[in-house]
UniProtKB/Swiss-Prot annotation:
Name this protein carries in UniProt: Glycerol-3-phosphate acyltransferase
Lineage, broadest ranks: Bacteria, Bacillati, Cyanobacteriota, Cyanophyceae, Synechococcales
Main subcellular location of this protein, as a coarse class: membrane
UniProt keyword annotation of Signal present: no
Coiled coil: none
Enzyme class: transferase
Gene Ontology CC entries for this record: plasma membrane
UniProt membrane topology term: Multi-pass membrane protein
Amino acid sequence: MHILIISISYFLGSLPTGFLFGKFLKNIDLRLTGSGSTGATNVLRNVGKWPAFFVFIIDVGKGLIAVKIAQHYTNQNLFEVLAGIAAISGHIWPIWLKGKGGKAVATGLGMFIALSWKIGFASLGIFLIILAKSKIVSLSSISAAIFLPFLMFLDIGSTNHPYFFISLVVSILVIWKHRTNIRRLLKGEELKINDINK
């Protein structure tokens, strides 16, 4: 059962939401357009606001549902975390798109809302505050990722817990996936949310 749920979590995470919206609505391959990501930000810039909104909601749902399925069948924190990791892995490295997917932000948010809604919404709050000030999605995502392990530690009071471990892993993973964005930020070349193309 555990292996089955982990597999389901991966395939759930690997649903290429942004790619499908790009293909069906604009006949474009997001992997070859803009930032090359299939996430909501690239959808926003190249497909439209409403498609981006739906992609974001669905991608959040992928992480949330994967963890909720695990929670339904077990009360083991480690197993919940493994299901979340599987969903995030599917989102970043989807088998359908030869391993080229999104950057784990929305799916990771869904996972943390399921694991600890306080941490999930606190991270979302940090993201929205930075976004309101900077208008730069990548900076907002990176900022939320940096704060994530600290928020989790404050919530559970321990570094020896699967939730803290996954918060640290996801933080590092999100920052790593934004490494090209970081280079542009340092050069002052990163575009803002209302810019059309990267």
